Swiss-Prot record:
One of its GO terms (molecular function) is carbon-nitrogen lyase activity. This is 7-carboxy-7-deazaguanine synthase. InterPro entries: 7-CO-7-deazaguanine_synth-like, Aldolase_TIM, rSAM. Residues 133-153 are annotated as: Disordered. Catalyzes the complex heterocyclic radical-mediated conversion of 6-carboxy-5,6,7,8-tetrahydropterin (CPH4) to 7-carboxy-7-deazaguanine (CDG), a step common to the biosynthetic pathways of all 7-deazapurine-containing compounds. Residues 35-253 form the Radical SAM core domain. Belongs to the radical SAM superfamily. 7-carboxy-7-deazaguanine synthase family. SUPFAM superfamilies: Radical SAM enzymes (SSF102114). Its EC number is 4.3.99.3. Keywords: 4Fe-4S, Iron, Iron-sulfur, Lyase, Magnesium, Metal-binding, Plasmid, S-adenosyl-L-methionine. [4Fe-4S] cluster binds at residues 48, 52, 55. It holds the Pfam family Radical_SAM.
Length: 257
């Protein structure tokens, strides 16, 4: 079950020590990107500085829910999954939280391989093995027509915040990085190409086409079926990687997958 449904918000806080707002903590397979198929513990924080209309973790952004868990308790829960040595810190936007660095430091000291899934608008100095950076394209903006709450109130804020080229460049300079783009349809490609050119100019690190990942938007079998082949074709045409959403293919839209 999601942590927020099983843990008292204050009881797990551990006093004044480092803690994070945790929406879910579970064991599954990494479903996306270079490490797809890897057994992983997912630590999902709540809270985000953006509002993608298609957000697949609605209760970390549009209606955030969480339990406050101490870093000690998070580590204990991670260690209870004995077959996983890979931890995915995700959200929401996990790098919003100062104590994400404390958690990553602790995980590194214990020998875990870590992926941080981020929208690329925040940089922190932390031991991150793979920065899975998903810049948000214009097609993610919650207009009045696509806003799940129906009013488009977040459109201007989201659009103003969604791309920070300097931060994207800094992440690429400091970490092993994959750039993962959520593709809604072929009209996203010109923006992807333009943004890639800007990021490559902003970094001293080579970003190869093999570091660019195209992923179809969708959280159900039906939604992925409608886009999968089209996005795979785009990946081949441009020389980029294609990633499935393996967890959706296996478990549809079930929670904690």
């Amino acid at each position: 079950m999601p942590v927020s449904e099983t843990t008292d918000r204050q009881a797990s806080n551990g006093g004044d020590g480092p803690a994070l707002p945790i929406n879910e903590l579970f064991y599954s397979l990494q479903g996306e990107g270079k490490l797809a198929g890897t057994p992983s513990v997912f630590v999902r924080t709540s809270g985000c500085n953006l509002r993608c209309w298609f957000c697949d973790s609605y209760h970390t952004s549009w209606e955030p829910t969480h339990a406050t868990m101490s870093v000690d308790d998070i580590i204990a829960e991670v260690q209870s999954y004995e077959h996983a040595d890979h931890v995915v810190l995700t959200g929401g936007e996990p790098l919003l939280h100062d104590d994400a660095v404390v958690l990553l430091d602790r995980l590194a000291a214990l020998g875990y391989h870590t992926t941080v899934e981020t929208n690329g608008t925040i940089h922190r100095d932390a031991p991150i093995d793979l920065a899975s950076v998903s810049p948000k394209l214009a097609s993610s903006t919650p207009t009045a027509e696509t806003d799940p709450k129906g009013d488009g109130e977040w459109a201007a804020r989201h659009d103003a915040r969604r791309i920070d080229v300097a931060t994207l460049g800094a992440l690429a300079d400091d970490y092993d990085t994959q750039l993962k783009f959520v593709v809604t349809d072929p009209s996203d490609m010109p923006e992807i190409e333009s943004l890639l050119a800007e990021i490559r100019t902003a970094t001293d690190t080579r970003i190869g086409d093999e570091d660019v990942v195209l992923m179809p938007e969708g959280t159900t079998h039906a939604e992925l079926d409608a886009r999968r082949n089209e996005v795979a074709t785009l990946a081949m045409e441009h020389g980029y990687r294609y990633t499935p959403r393996l967890h959706v293919a296996l478990w549809n839209d079930a929670p904690e997958t």
